[in-house]
Amino acid sequence: MEESNRSSTVLFDKYNIGRLLGTGNFAKVYHGTEISTGDDVAIKVIKKDHVFKRRGMMEQIEREIAVMRLLRHPNVVELREVMATKKKIFFVMEYVNGGELFEMIDRDGKLPEDLARKYFQQLISAVDFCHSRGVFHRDIKPENLLLDGEGDLKVTDFGLSALMMPEGLGGRRGSSDDLLHTRCGTPAYVAPEVLRNKGYDGAMADIWSCGIVLYALLAGFLPFIDENVMTLYTKIFKAECEFPPWFSLESKELLSRLLVPDPEQRISMSEIKMIPWFRKNFTPSVAFSIDETIPSPPEPPTKKKKKDLNEKEDDGASPRSFNAFQFITSMSSGFDLSNLFEIKRKPKRMFTSKFPAKSVKERLETAAREMDMRVKHVKDCKMKLQRRTEGRKGRLSVTAEVFEVAPEVSVVEFCKTSGDTLEYYLFCEDDVRPALKDIVWSWQGDDDEDDVTTNDNVDTNDNKINNVS
């Protein structure tokens, strides 16, 4: 019996898994239904043995999870949950039932300019948001742009995406900090600088691909087409394309600035948003804060026990302590699926110091004031730091708390409370690291030698799902 005709099966008592929607290079995607709500979902199933056999596959899966965790936007397909058994990994994602934008173009040909503009506006909103989180898609094409039941665009397939984090968060420092060096994507949509394979700006490469998509929406075909690959590359390098006569003057002017071979001369995201053609009937999409995606559950009520007469009230005058388990798990990084089952509510950074907590706290406060941050003491070993200037999403606010592991060992934890997540990461790496290097013993994750580890501390009851393969 074909997999697409199999009866529904149950995954972890939470989802009914139904028909096969599609098959990729190393995954199968099924239609599913959340049992408690009846909501439709898409479930990507990956066999672990396929992951371990293929070099770089674990890294790719880890990257896709990390990327999609950062992105909560109405025009980006949402990753809802990650689960695993001994043999399989399951991505539970938003189900988008309107099909691919590619299918619409293939079926209907060119779109009316107003409809093409709407999809381009939503694409730019989504891609600009991704860039603000440090994510470059690198494979933007109509096949990776889906349409929902309301006719709105959704960006999907982050398997090739590059997550640009500062050093210590997965990125690397060097003379070409901001350049990517992996040739990804589909040739007809790929920017000239990517094809040259000499390093490129991921944001500008995505903008080129957005230009290709806009051309395809308006024309019904691609701007650069040739059966000979080398001839195709030559056309892309020179941006040799013709505009059909039905293109409006305004759309041609925008495309002429999008499809520029030199990325330094190519139009930027902020400039695109100022173009009158783009702004016509534009309604900005409202992104969701990553901190608001899943609220923290309320603490269960507990009975207050009577205090011993000799027991002191916790007035916050001394630092909280870390036990050994908390310390080890907090300072460890690497690919651990069990860490991916919970939505991370607050982006955190942490370092250890061989100085007493009191000394660390004083040094931290001095450094914050030198960085022109407002400092407010929440309690004796916890403070709130706030930038005086507005950032991309308001003023960056961070809490810093000092914990005592031993009399001469302290842990400092930074946690973003408001503002832009990428701005927060850059604050930790570019401002805090240099300012506190004299007291830091080790930053979280810096000592990990293996980028990929395995962990079987997950639900291993494979009998809960029998028919998905």
Swiss-Prot record:
Residues 157-193 are annotated as: Activation loop. It comes from the Eukaryota. Residues 454-469 have a biased composition (Low complexity). Residues 346-376 are annotated as: PPI. The active site is at 139 (proton acceptor). Belongs to the protein kinase superfamily. CAMK Ser/Thr protein kinase family. SNF1 subfamily. The activation loop within the kinase domain is the target of phosphorylation/activation by upstream protein kinases. The PPI motif mediates the interaction with the ABI (abscisic acid-insensitive) phosphatases. This is CBL-interacting serine/threonine-protein kinase 16.
